[in-house]
Design a protein with these regions (language model features):
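Beta-strand-turn-beta hairpins that frame and shape the catalytic cleft
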Residues: 35-48, 141-155, 178-182, 240-247, ...
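Conserved beta-sheet core of the metallophosphoesterase superfamily
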Residues: 190-270
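Short, flexible loop segments at the rims of nucleotide/cofactor-binding pockets, characterized by
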Residues: 26, 53-58, 85-89, 159-163, ...
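Membrane-embedded segments
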Residues: 43-137
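Short, Asp-centered acidic motifs that coordinate Mg2+ and/or phosphate
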Residues: 75-76, 109, 134-135, 151, ...
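Binuclear metal-dependent hydrolase catalytic cores centered on His/Asp/Glu-rich metal-binding motifs
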Residues: 127, 131-134, 146-187, 193-194, ...
């Protein structure tokens, strides 16, 4: 192989590596769509699930994010925690404005994540979100009508609330189910699956894992996630927990708030269609 050929090959490999890296660092929003069939609904219901915003920016007035949600025409918007951030560099008002804009169009239901607790002002954050139109669930269950269908949405705080309180909240929302209405558990933590199984929920929605931060599609679903460590089992996607319970874990919306950039792991809006079986 001549020196010129070696140089050409090296340049080609470097260019290919650069293109691959740029593709991997793509931080544009993506929509992940899932569908669940149920005998408990007679017409489709569409949910938009947003997690782990961490007060990140999505255009002026959060237009990029809001437009993506609007195009999906959801019946409900569900927020699974870490919408605000404890880092003072991430403006809380941006997160609050996002929730307010969502609540002006759709019913919005919210539970806390660990970062709301890490602000040291979790009760104030809850009240600020209520003032912006979100229904804040802290161990409570609500019968919600959407697209002419009744759903039961139970929401629990992040375990940062304290383990005893967290378990009491979980027991409360479990007991609120009637066995006939499609039931959803809103939680922040996907790794607590053993606590969610066998409770009769049709659907568990969670975030927190940020998609494992780095992904290699087709090889690893995530490199590392909080409270799961290396190669997390519940980094993002759909999971069958058995007993008729499905879990959807959103890879979340965090971008500039993270210390390590996402790799092959675009921030996402989850759209879930509940369809008549």
């Amino acid at each position: 192989m001549t020196q010129k050929t070696k140089r050409t090959l090296a340049l080609g490999l470097a260019a290919a590596a650069g293109v691959t890296l740029l593709a991997g660092l793509d931080a544009r929003l993506v929509v992940r769509t899932y569908a669940i069939e149920s005998e408990q609904v007679s017409t489709p219901v569409r949910l938009a699930v947003l997690t782990d915003l961490h007060a990140c920016a999505y255009g002026e007035g959060q237009k990029n994010l809001l437009d993506v949600v609007a195009v999906q025409s959801p019946d409900l918007v569900l927020l699974c925690g870490d919408i605000v951030d404890d880092d003072p560099r991430m403006p809380e008002e941006r997160a609050l404005a996002t929730v307010e804009a969502l609540a002006e169009v759709w019913p919005v239901y919210y539970v806390t994540g660990n970062h709301e607790f890490w602000t040291g002002r979790v009760e104030e954050v809850r009240e600020l979100l209520r003032a912006r139109g979100a229904v804040v669930l802290e161990g409570e269950s609500a019968a919600v009508t959407a697209a002419g269908q009744t759903l039961r949405i139970g929401g629990i705080d992040d375990p940062s609330v304290g383990e005893d309180i967290w378990r009491e909240q979980l027991e409360t929302v479990t007991a609120a189910q009637d066995g006939e209405t499609f039931s959803i558990l809103l939680t922040h933590r996907p790794e607590r699956v053993e606590d969610y199984t066998g409770r009769g929920f049709d659907l568990v929605l969670a975030g927190h894992a940020h998609g494992g931060q780095w992904r290699i599609p087709g090889l690893i679903n995530g490199l590392i996630a909080p409270n799961q460590g290396l190669f997390p089992q519940y980094a993002g996607g759909a999971y069958d927990l058995g007993g008729g319970t499905a879990m959807i874990v959103s890879r979340g919306l965090a971008r500039e708030s993270t210390q390590v950039p996402r790799l092959f792991n675009r921030p996402e809006v989850v759209v879930l269609d509940i369809l008549p079986s």
